[in-house]
Amino acid sequence: MAENKFLDKINSPADVKKLSVPQLEQLAKEIRQLLISVISHTGGHLAPNLGVVELTLALHKVFNTPEDKIIFDVGHQAYIHKIITGRREQFPTLRQYGGLSGFPKRSESEHDAFGTGHSSTSISAALGMACARDLQGEDYNVVAVIGDGSMTGGMAFEALNNAGMLHKNMIVVLNDNEMSISKNVGAMSEYLYQLRTGETYNKIKNDIEGWLKNMEFGSDVLKAIRRLKGSVKYLMVLTSIFEELGFTYLGPVDGHDLESLLDVMQAAKKIDGPVMVHVLTKKGKGYKPAEESPNKFHGTGPFDIATGKKITNPNAPVSYTEVFGKTLTKLADTDDKIVGITAAMPDGTGLNIFAEAHKDHFFDVGIAEQHAVTAAAGMAAAGMKPVAAIYSTFMQRAYDSIMHDICMQKLHVTLCLDRAGLVGDDGYTHHGVFDYAYLRSIPNMTIMAPKDENELQHMLKTALDFDGPVSVRYPRGSGVGVALDTQWQDLPIGKAEVLRTGKDVCFWAIGSMVQTALDAAELLEAQGISAGVVNMRFAKPLDVELLREHAQSYGKIITLEEGVLAGGVGSAILEELNENKLLEQCDVRCFGIPDEFVMHGDKKLLFRDLGLDTPTIAAKAAAFVKGEEE
């Protein structure tokens, strides 16, 4: 990488403030080179960050963190913020075990005002800070940086509505690149398109300039407006949706023109009440492959800089996500009742495969998990077979809809939870470890988890043939590598599969932990310990008959789950055994995620730290059998 003229001297925002606009432009080039170089090795959110380099520099040039608060919605576009707030030298450790988080993290830096990872939270948090500031008689600026994709989330609208009513001094920077991960959908996206293209500006008053000149700080605002993309018409006085909500609207401004950005931010600081600054950026700017395919470089693994091609293992098994997408597509080929629903993640969930074949039966509702689930309930009530594919961590946002709109009415909705379990580099905001617990407590819910990618096919067919609420959860990444059946059978509801018989102890494992149980049983056999293995298949209902039999015949059971122990599958087994007064005959140990938020890092290292790797489980099982536990 070429020698840096300015970047190597940037150790805090104070160093950014010393630079002129031409120097900042050079710094932006150097930062882009660093982003491309590091992320090509570590993986990460490349395209979003390439698009906000100038914007982030302008924010830190104008505002004074940590006194002023800058909140990045989702936070995946905060890499530049990290680089210029004292973490430049650590940046090569991004998303690595023990290294920098890929998202803002309050414990990582005083400049990270608010931790983020999920969408559409920034305006609410910023408003809360502004209220706290005023109540405590303090004086600082609060800025929320939110993408147009996040603006499809209902929470953002709730916050805008409340902020306009409270009229607190705060700034919302709308980073408009026409993308979230996939192409944005919804009325707000259409509205922003009209703002970008100037189709709704016929109501602009001729006397705006005179009005501004007569108001306090008006000349500064006018100076900024004149730099806005196009002309003064882009100030929507009392006509834009943001003005109707009580915001002063400034924009759109070119998000890669530093002079324009600096001027508009300075002006926004001086306006009383909430301000919306509309910034137009290009996702992936500065790296041609990312500009041409911004969705592919939204979140990427390691890649070759010269070609932009991802560095992958050609021998890796097919992913669970792909198996899901292809299976659902094939099932829909012969059943026109099936519909697929996603919340702005068609590629991430595999529903892009389904959408290509069944366009009219595919619905991308935007970043709106609660709406997605209730819309699915409505479809089910009207006779369809909806499948809502949403990441496990994001499904948390739809909990009330699952309970109130699906399960209370016993509607036939299939919830497919991708990225269940530990996801690795994205860390605790994205680990999908709570779904067993939060779904198991809901009456009428059936919960399945496949031991491998082939069983996922059978479970999906089972779910669609079952008349009631069903959830199927499966992990991120490649499958186990088993052969895929071409004909699928319904699995008996609530029945487990005995994979291995033993005498001394039995593993009751579910989902991704079944293979770990089999491997641990092999290690135990080498020590003269005979271990059975059960593939639970169902977290709810349990195979009560088999469980009672094993409690009496083995006398020792170990549960394995890639989810939290509190309220999880192990808890379900303990509850059942206790209810049947079998805990006096059977000793149980539960292995899973402890009561903590798990950090980011390579999954193998995280499993080792949690004691969920095969050698540790085998060692603990041996000690359990021998009565040698510490």
Where are these regions (language model features)?
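Structural signature of the thiamine diphosphate
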Residues: 221-289, 412-417, 436-486, 614-630
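Peripheral docking tails and interdomain loops at the edges
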Residues: 302-316, 424-426, 446, 571-630
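N-terminal amphipathic, basic-rich helices that act as targeting or association modules
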Residues: 2-84, 243-262, 275-281
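Non-catalytic terminal/interface segments that mediate subunit docking, oligomerization
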Residues: 69, 281-396, 401-411, 468, ...
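Cofactor-binding active-site loop characterized by glycine-rich and histidine/acidic residues
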Residues: 45-166, 320, 338, 342-343, ...
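Long, well-ordered, tryptophan-enriched scaffold segments
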Residues: 178-324
